[in-house]
């Protein structure tokens, strides 16, 4: 399939899922497997702001972070053959959700609260998972908090065109599964040329 005919809608891939679901690990591997570019939105936001996300939250608040996130997302408008790793809460910000829905294909990396807690219990760089005054949660407390946040986010996560369960699965297997499904999705999609029009049938 020529690059000039690949549909933009289906070859701009947004990876969503809770922190710890594997987006930042799977994303570059998936992009490499597909021959696509890769962008980690959280890393791009930090570069744009000149400081880590924890400081953005602490000094400017979540609303300022979400707006920075949206502006970063808009830089990929019109791109194709790119995998974009989203922050876990990006879909909860309505303007970002609307942009993503119209710009590309959403893929949900799904994992259980128990497995997410196991992966995140020793992480200190997730602002929404901290206790009061930055106190570290016990694993049980963390799992319960993740469960509550997942319940809030799940309706939008479930809008994804593709969902892949990452629990009890090797990273390589997940990448292979996603590669097959995305390539199938791109093949089935209407072909769009550089002028944005579908080519005429012979």
Swiss-Prot record:
Binding site residues for substrate: 42, 66, 88, 153
Class of this enzyme: transferase
PROSITE patterns: SHIKIMATE_KINASE
Binding site for ATP: 20-25, 126
GO MF term set: ATP binding; magnesium ion binding; shikimate kinase activity
HAMAP family associated with the record: Shikimate_kinase
The protein's role, per its UniProt record: Catalyzes the specific phosphorylation of the 3-hydroxyl group of shikimic acid using ATP as a cosubstrate.
Family assignment from sequence similarity: Belongs to the shikimate kinase family.
PANTHER family linked: SHIKIMATE KINASE (PTHR21087), SHIKIMATE KINASE 1, CHLOROPLASTIC (PTHR21087:SF16)
Subunit details: Monomer.
Protein name stated in the entry: Shikimate kinase
């Amino acid at each position: 399939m020529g690059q000039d005919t690949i549909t933009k809608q289906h070859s701009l891939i947004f990876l969503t899922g809770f922190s710890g679901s594997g987006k930042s690990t799977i994303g570059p591997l998936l992009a490499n497997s597909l021959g696509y570019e890769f962008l980690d939105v959280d890393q791009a936001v930090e570069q744009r702001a000149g400081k880590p996300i924890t400081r953005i939250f602490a000094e400017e608040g979540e609303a300022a972070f979400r707006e920075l996130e949206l502006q970063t997302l808009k830089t990929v408008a019109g791109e194709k053959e790119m995998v974009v790793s989203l922050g876990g809460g990006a879909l909860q910000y309505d303007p970002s959700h609307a942009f993503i829905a119209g710009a590309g294909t959403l893929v949900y990396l799904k994992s259980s609260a128990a497995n997410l807690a196991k992966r995140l219990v020793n992480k200190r760089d997730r602002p929404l998972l901290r206790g009061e005054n930055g106190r570290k949660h016990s694993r049980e407390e963390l799992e319960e908090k993740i469960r509550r946040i997942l319940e809030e986010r799940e309706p939008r996560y479930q809008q994804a065109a593709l969902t892949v369960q990452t629990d009890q699965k090797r990273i390589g297997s997940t990448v292979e599964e996603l590669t097959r499904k995305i390539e199938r999705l791109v093949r089935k999609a209407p072909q769009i040329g550089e002028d944005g029009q579908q080519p005429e049938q012979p």
